[in-house]
Amino acid sequence: MEQQHRNQKSMQDQNDEIEDVQHGPFPVEQLQASGIAALDVKKLKDAGLCTVESVVYAPRKELLQIKGISEAKVDKIIEAASKLVPLGFTSASQLHAQRLEIIQITSGSKELDKILEGGIETGSITEIYGEFRCGKTQLCHTLCVTCQLPLDQGGGEGKAMYIDAEGTFRPQRLLQIADRYGLNGPDVLENVAYARAYNTDHQSRLLLEAASMMVETRFALMIVDSATALYRTDFSGRGELSARQMHLAKFLRSLQKLADEFGVAVVITNQVVAQVDGSAVFAGPQIKPIGGNIMAHASTTRLALRKGRAEERICKVVSSPCLAEAEARFQISVEGVTDVKD
């Protein structure tokens, strides 16, 4: 009887393992079972391709640039990866079923969650832009805590990753917000992987490190605050505009790949610039997010924040494939983002 129980438990463990393999991203080591040499797999990992999905998503010319991998090997790798992760057509009903499994991470405000239909969506990029002191970084701090909550409380049951380009990340804010949700402060801090980015190349390299970390453990959220700050200083003038936009496009594409591979919610903050033209004489200068069309096309959902009275802030859904254009009021307090207390 005991032996039968052990066999059943062993079969259950095997089924759980199979289920994990089927639903999670495939580690790139699985290519070895398809005849790819361990040395070549190591070269893929060193190039930042830590999952089979990342190999499939990469253009062929990118794989050819990896030192020590020949053209014949690249073709063999692509063939093996494509069998594990087929990228063909699927029916809209299958896609709809997959979309129903997407998790929304609560923002901390019920009013804000209402216009977001549950919260920040996983598996896509959400851009938050606005002037200074409008709550972008405070919303990011709140999300770092709420993403660790259980699913039934609006969380993502995962860790958070924070790339800080402006030096505005404050761990003590996470402790204050954790108290609001009854979470253990030290555990919350331990579940946030933090990195300070010092230039645009460093910011891009951090994404390679992020991918290898996401293979090892479950992350629910990836924040880049701000995605564009370093581009404003590293590239100057119209002469470097083309190079800046190309570099930014590659960075945003890498972020989208992380969202696709690991199902994380990617949140990027963006700075704004005053748009001074003829109408500004009468209506005052209008603001617009920097990054141009490349930034607009890369973001799945765009949220504009602006200041209200005192600590009140207003969030507007500017563009989204599934959310209606709407506004919500929220408040910045010691507990992070909360509903406005009238």
Swiss-Prot record:
Any one Gene Ontology biological process term?
Answer: mitotic recombination
What's the protein name? DNA repair protein RAD51 homolog
Pfam families from the UniProt entry: HHH_5, Rad51
Source organism (scientific name): Solanum lycopersicum (Tomato)
Q: Where in the cell is it found?
A: Nucleus
In the record, what lineage is assigned to the organism producing the protein?
A: Eukaryota, Viridiplantae, Streptophyta, Embryophyta, Tracheophyta
Gene Ontology MF, one: single-stranded DNA binding
Q: Does Nucleotidyltransferase count among this protein's keywords?
A: no
**Keywords on record:** ATP-binding, DNA-binding, Nucleotide-binding, Nucleus
InterPro entries listed in its UniProt record: AAA+_ATPase, DNA_recomb/repair_Rad51, DNA_recomb/repair_Rad51_C, DNA_recomb/repair_RecA-like, DNA_repair_Rad51/TF_NusA_a-hlx, P-loop_NTPase, RecA_ATP-bd, RecA_monomer-monomer_interface
